[in-house]
Amino acid sequence: MKSPKKYLKFLLFKPLQLPFALCVRLIHFFTQQHQKLNRHQFLKVLFLATLVICLLFGQVVSAQTQNASLLVEQGIKDYDAGNFPNAVKHWQEALNQYKNNPSDAAVVNENLARVYQQLGQNKEAIESLSAAIRDYGAVGNIQQVGRMQSELAQVYSNLGQPRKAIALLCGKLVDKSKSSENQPSQEIKCTPESAEQIATKYNDKRGQVAALGILGEAYRLIGSYDQAIKYLDTAQQVSPESKFLVFNSLGNAYKSRGQLRELQADSANKAGIFSKEKEFTKKSQEDYDRAYQYFQDSIKFARNEKQPLAEMRGLLNLIQLGSQTNQSKFINDGEFNTTIKDALEVLEELPDSATKVYGAIDLAYLQHDAKGTSPFTYCPTGLVLSGDNEALNLLENSVLTSKKLQDNRLISFSNGALGHFWECSPDNEKALKNEKALKYTQAAIIAADSKLSAKDSLYLWEWQAGRILDKQNRQEEAIASYQRAFDTLEDIRQDILTAERDVQFDFRDVVRPLYRTLAQSRLDLLGVGAIADEGRAKELSKVVNTIDALKLAELQNYFGNDCILSGLNPKQVGELLEDNSVAFKNTGFLSSIILDGKTGILLQLPNQATKFKWIEDPNQQGDKVVSSDTLQKKIAEFRTGLVKREEINYDTTIASQLYDWIIRPFAEDIKPEKVKTLVFIQDGFLRSIPMAALYDSKLNKYLVETYAVATTPSLRLNTPKLRDRSTQKALILGLTKEATIDGKTFEQLFAVPDEVSAVESIFPNHTPLIDDNFLAESFQQTLDKTTYPIVHIASHAQFGIIPEDTFIVTGKNQKLTISQLENSLRNLNSKSDSVELLTLTACETAVGDDRATLGLAGVALQVGVKTAIASLWSVTDQSTSELVKTFYTNYRNTGMSIAEALQTAQIRMIHAKKLPPSEGVNPMYDHPAYWAPMVAIGNWL
């Protein structure tokens, strides 16, 4: 083989030294950070959280076969000049000549992978890297196989698929559910064929640092911050080279962990565990201190090694840490302003690159007291660069730079950012600015859609276009744009939402408003009569599908993995109602939807058109629509009155008012002779109340006296079916003792012994695990041995605002986390082994906390059971035992549905004062505080 005149040495770990080897910052979904209450940055810091190795492992490489060497050499020149399309053309031609030469084909595929990444063509990059791995393996170059696996892992990680990255880098994933604050994650030895082990075996220090660095970053992206820090610490010990990259990633890892601990402190505060709040707050501040120091060190080392791109990343990370609320103490005003000045100076000197484009956008949208979410989802205020068109100039320059680079991904982000600037400009010359905003936004859409170069941002620009069109009073075009944004987001949502929940983008600021905007826009068109009568049903069906998708996304976001959607029915809600019209013939479905300032109710009945009504108060002066704030206050007041149960004779005033607002408008449609069961699919704060306790003042009846009542997060998640109840084996778990978990005392449940005895008497074939015998380990071992269709848990179950604070109290002051419960139940061997019914009789959810009740609503689906019977709040009284006993008797011995079995049990307690003493039911149990909190979730048949 004849070497080309210019042979470019393979450079493993210094990709920043030459222009053509600059790292492409592939924007992905999980590099965002959060502030309190899941405040994650989404596309705000467009490249700050740079992977530890920008693993274009250096430079494009020359192949050395005589006939193709000139093509390879020409491709290198094209690449070096930034003419990436021509580089692809020449290298593809060379590759065709290397079909029977795997050694040189591997080199060309390696080069193609890098240029495809420059062009934002990730699918092609993955194919080329996979081919390079195959070819290097064929010729026995195992060290290079390891390096290519690391590079492929980085691409997957950048695309929001860090678990695939971990599989390539190590082969095994640390199980977070088997670790805790006091029990660190187990040590994992990577498999022999993994990138990390290949590098170790061949003493490839640079390859080892690369694998460890990307591995650490991947663990950061799935929320395993302790594991991330461990790998990154190891990376800096293996080799002293390019510490600025490792330090930058360590800074991001500590910052992410600090934000998680800040979130946990807030959750502890809401749960009343103030000692834990103090502990998490202290740890959070310590992590922020470390992040600050690592960013400083990263900047210092980058300057010493004359690496302006790395210096830029460090500066912007430091600026963002300083601009976030509650972080200002780390950087005083003087240092903050100096750092911005330094960043602007470095930006000016950078060569044209992705870093220069994203850096300009970040600086342009830099805010004082940043919200921590994407600046493209709202109009930012308090821009730091607010004078002399500084921000505008940066954005316009970013557009010019992206065009020079011919990178559709960069073109998309730069035009989208500039379009958003004009969208948010003051109202003077409004028409002209809207035209400019739309022009640049449409350019962003075209670029993002070109070979799916930036599909992860396409929905942002479609959404942005919809908002601009709305301003121009082009409502139908706006809705079409919102719909395209929705469709794109639905397509990529699985990747966005399947990381651990604490590392996802800010769901509340990104997904939720888009879905609600689309639904409200369609309803507004219906309200003004813009849709003909024959089209109303179709439009309402679209609204239903949009809101259903939102509720699915909320659940996936809360639990942070894709298991909850494993049984998702691909059909839309209307199709499911039609397919199951016989099973659902006596069932009405009421879906609530909270929109801008008002709340609506959708009624669906099999084989009938969907109906919609805003919640209204006929006694209200002027506009009859009840504001969402008013409704939320009324809901909180209703629940508080139930939980406190201060009065022996319950005052039904609020319950009656809510009935009149929510149920009565549909009275003619849900007459009891036609509808026997009402299934509620609730939104937001409406999840926190038991609908069974609403009161019909005209009939002097609670809702549950007329209808069986159930709730489900979505019909698509667990389409109800009649189940075989012939197998009556029960696993009964209970805790009778007082327990202390994380500084919070859970009082003794005096009624649990009676409750357990009652369940044992109904299910003779049972296994009890009580008090110290009820532990996570014994629970798992028992399930491994025997199938139990029924699992009854009589212990405190706390549902927090994050899954980490969702657990069941077990013996020995320990807890069974929702993740452990899920793993235990999902590890059952087959569908025939699955749990049909999970009962939790002492659940606690925070008042007014819709995220906690979201956890309760999704628990059955999350842990893989068909139905959950659970309480909205704990009732420390014999009433639970009475209710459960009647429910199980009905469930086992009659042909009642699950909802009807619960209904009958609740009606029995409502009539407690009328029952003879021989029944043994305390007359005070007629108060809804005792029977209303138990709800049926999931399959109600």
Predicted regions span which residues?
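N-terminal secretory signal peptides that target proteins for export/translocation
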Residues: M1-R39
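Bacterial N-terminal signal peptides
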Residues: L46-L56
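N-terminal leader/linker segments that initiate helical-solenoid repeat arrays
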Residues: C54-N111
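Non-membrane alpha-helical segments in proteins
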Residues: S69-D80, D104-Q118, R147-N158, G213-E217
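Alpha-helical solenoid repeat scaffolds used for protein-protein interaction
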Residues: C170, K176-S179, Q183, Y225-Q227, ...
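Catalytic-core domains of enzymes
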Residues: D562, Q572, A583, I681-I790, ...
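Catalytic cores of nucleophile-dependent amide-cleaving enzymes
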Residues: T711-L715, K721, P789, I793-E882, ...
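An often Trp-containing, charged/polar helix-loop segment at the C-terminal end
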Residues: T880-L941
